[in-house]
Amino acid sequence: MANLPLFITPSILSADLGRLQEEVASIENDADGIQVDVMDGHFVPNLSFGAPVVKCIRTKLPVDVHLMVSNPQDRIGEFMALHVANITFHAEAVEDTNSRRALIEAIKKGGATAGISLKPQTPVAAIDDVVRLVDLVLMMSVEPGFGGQDFLPDVLPKIA
């Protein structure tokens, strides 16, 4: 396997929203990007940020939006309008190959790179249909929907 680049992209999920700009600034020299976890309370049981928070982030770093939502195709427009660098959606939220391909194409046409994410228990083979079309694969090492969870080491063999 080729040596692929490694990117450090911390999530703002656990950030103090009252000091969000300060917290973003504190990592700008050490991070390769900022990840914004968008949760809808349906795909995952929690709610989090949306486009208004992304709009408020002032940074030189690329913003990576991780959509933990049902029907991600209905949400990409609001983030593409903000010129985010990457949009990642969950394979489990879009199970049909044609729908996945259409979503990846729409993200790329909108000027962002496209990523696909897998929950810890989802086999890597679940994305064989589109893995060569995406720019990144996010292997969740916690159950999506909550911050501050313990790392699930069973995910490591999927990465190798």
Over which residues does each language-model region extend?
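Conserved N-terminal beta1-alpha1 strand-loop-helix module at the mouth
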Residues: M1-T88, A93-K109, T113-A114, A125-V134, ...
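Short loop/edge segments at beta-strand edges and connector loops
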Residues: I116-L118
